């Protein structure tokens, strides 16, 4: 397996990170995950635009142009012969010696790019049968719009869900539902798609954006606004979405069944529209539903 370290492809076991890299010591960096279908990137530009936007919000300079970055990632995918999978890439602020919270202003740090590509098949069964979720207080910082390497709050919530045999943790600040530990959450109520507004309390998921777009194009009303735990529990349908899980229905929350406990009709429609978008961009999907 080859991975990318700056502009070099190296064997996985030969890849190294400096112990005084600010990403390693502070989580000082940003990242993205881009999906591949039939060996082709899906919503690549949207992901990379978000990467550069996240970097700009923390005054981090990515040491490659968008064109150079695409060329590097395409080489990474080709070298590993990825058909259906994910590319994980991150950029840290770089090495600072000696370690200091303060970013030096007397000399520029050189950002460090790393990336890996892996085959990750689509989970067709999960898209139909769905999964369960727990609710958990959202204790993360207030800049969730930045796709930062700082994910400890997400990790704790995700692992709590895992310990309870749940797929996800739906996060809330008091009564206000925000998103999940590693995905966005949406509800359907009276035929309306309802999801939290794209503000600082959530990451504006690329899949979320595609869902909103196809919903509007196909006459499904969309409401981007706060909703409560009560709204969540009384929803007709609940689903989560992300680059890797596409649109996955939630059938039970905190052990309580959502509606009839099955994927709802609008969730199914939205997933079909989503698959059509993938097909247009990347070609027909084998076994797609």
Curated annotation (Swiss-Prot):
Q: What is its EC number?
A: 2.6.1.21
Pfam families associated with the record: Aminotran_4 (PF01063)
Q: How does it assemble?
A: Homodimer.
State the protein's name.
Answer: D-alanine aminotransferase
Q: Name one GO biological process term.
A: D-amino acid biosynthetic process
Keywords from UniProt, A to Z, are:
Aminotransferase, Pyridoxal phosphate, Transferase
Purpose = Acts on the D-isomers of alanine, leucine, aspartate, glutamate, aminobutyrate, norvaline and asparagine. The enzyme transfers an amino group from a substrate D-amino acid to the pyridoxal phosphate cofactor to form pyridoxamine and an alpha-keto acid in the first half-reaction. The second half-reaction is the reverse of the first, transferring the amino group from the pyridoxamine to a second alpha-keto acid to form the product D-amino acid via a ping-pong mechanism. This is an important process in the formation of D-alanine and D-glutamate, which are essential bacterial cell wall components.
Q: Which InterPro entries match?
A: Aminotrans_IV, Aminotransferase-like, BCAT-like_C, BCAT-like_N, Class-IV_PLP-Dep_Aminotrnsfr, D_amino_transT
Q: Which organism is it from?
A: Listeria monocytogenes serotype 1/2a (strain 10403S)
- For the ligand (substrate), the binding residues are 31, 99, 101
Q: Which Gene3D superfamilies match?
A: 3.30.470.10, D-amino Acid Aminotransferase, subunit A, domain 2
PTM sites of type N6-(pyridoxal phosphate)lysine:
147
NCBIfam families assigned to the protein according to its UniProt record, in alphabetical order: D_amino_aminoT
Residues annotated as binding pyridoxal 5'-phosphate: 50, 179
Q: Which reaction does it catalyse?
A: D-alanine + 2-oxoglutarate = D-glutamate + pyruvate
GO CC aspect terms? cytosol
Its needed co-factors are: pyridoxal 5'-phosphate
The record's similarity note reads: Belongs to the class-IV pyridoxal-phosphate-dependent aminotransferase family.
MF terms per GO, please? D-alanine-2-oxoglutarate aminotransferase activity; pyridoxal phosphate binding
Q: Which CDD domains match?
A: D-AAT_like (cd01558)
Q: Which domain of life is it from?
A: Bacteria
């Amino acid at each position: 397996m080859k991975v990318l370290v700056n502009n070099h492809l190296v064997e996985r076991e030969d890849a190294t990170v400096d112990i005084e890299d600010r990403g390693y010591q502070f989580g000082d960096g940003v990242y993205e995950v881009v999906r591949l279908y039939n060996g082709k990137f899906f919503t690549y530009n949207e992901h990379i635009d978000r990467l550069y936007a996240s970097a700009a919000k923390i005054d981090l300079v990515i040491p490659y142009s968008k064109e150079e970055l695409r060329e590097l990632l395409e080489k990474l995918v080709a070298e590993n012969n990825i058909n259906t999978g994910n590319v994980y890439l991150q950029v840290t602020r770089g090495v600072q010696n000696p370690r200091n919270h303060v970013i030096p202003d007397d000399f520029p740090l050189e950002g460090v790019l790393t990336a890996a590509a892996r085959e990750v098949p689509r989970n067709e069964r999960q898209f139909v049968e769905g999964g369960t979720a727990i609710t958990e207080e959202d204790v993360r910082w207030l800049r969730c719009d930045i796709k930062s390497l700082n994910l400890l709050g997400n990790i704790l919530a995700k692992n709590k869900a895992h310990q309870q045999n749940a797929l996800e943790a739906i996060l809330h600040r008091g009564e206000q539902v925000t998103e999940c530990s590693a995905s966005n959450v949406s509800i359907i109520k009276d035929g309306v798609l309802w999801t939290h507004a794209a503000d600082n309390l959530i990451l504006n998921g690329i899949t979320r954006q595609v869902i909103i777009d196809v919903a509007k194009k196909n006459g499904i009303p969309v409401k981007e606004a706060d909703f409560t735990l009560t709204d969540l529990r009384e929803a007709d349908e609940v689903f989560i979405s992300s680059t890797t899980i596409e649109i996955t229905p939630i059938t039970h929350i905190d052990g309580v069944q959502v509606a009839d406990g099955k994927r709802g009709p609008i969730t199914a429609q939205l997933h079909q529209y989503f698959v059509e978008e993938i097909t247009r961009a990347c070609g027909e999907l084998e076994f797609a539903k």
